Amino acid sequence: MRSAHVDSFARDNLPPRELQPEFLFELPELRFPERLNCAAELLDRHVAEGRGDRACIRAPGISWTYAQLQEKANRIANVLVREMGVVPGNRVLLRAPNNPMAVACWFAVMKVGAIAVATMPLLRARELSTIIDKARATHALCEAALAEALREAAAASPVLREIRL
C-alpha cells in the first residue's frame, strides 16, 4: 500500500496484511485516484464546482459557506505546516467542543495529510495523556478554554511537541 505519509507510524501499526479486509473497488462509484485527500473531495471540490456560496455548516448564531470553511481550513493548514512543522502522517490532537472551528481544524489536518486525533472536551489530563501516548500525537490544536488539562497532559508526555490555542 503506497502512502504520501512521511511519518509512517499509522502504516507501521496496521495489522498484518493477512488480517486486513480485502478492499474491492470494482464499482465505478468506488474507483478513486491512487492519491486521495478527503478534504479535497469533501470541501474543496464544492468550491471548485461553483457551490462555494452555499451553506456548509451551521451552529447557533453561525453559518459558514463552503468557501468560508475552506478559507479557514486553509489558514489553519498553513499554520500547521509553516509554523508548527507538521508533515504528512503526523498525528494532530484536536481538543475542542463540537463547533464550526473544530470542523475547520479537522479539515486543515486532512489537507496537510496528517491524522486527526479528536478528543472529547470532558477528558481529564490523565485520559488525554493515554491518548497522546498511544497515538504518539506530536502536535495539538486546542480551544483556549480546554487548554489547562492538555498542558498538564503534555507535561507528562515527551511525544507532544507543540500546542496551539
Question: Where do the language-model regions lie?
Answer:
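Solvent-exposed alpha-helix faces
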Residues: 74-78, 97, 133, 145
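Structural core segment of the AMP-binding/adenylate-forming
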Residues: 1-9, 111-165
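Conserved AMP-binding/adenylate-forming
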Residues: 62-64, 79-126
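Flexible, non-catalytic linker and terminal segments flanking ANL/adenylate-forming cores
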Residues: 1-37
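AMP-dependent adenylate-forming
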Residues: 41-68
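Conserved N-terminal alpha-helix of the aminotransferase class I/II PLP-enzyme fold
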Residues: 56, 68-79
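Adenylate-forming
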Residues: 43-46, 69, 73, 92, ...
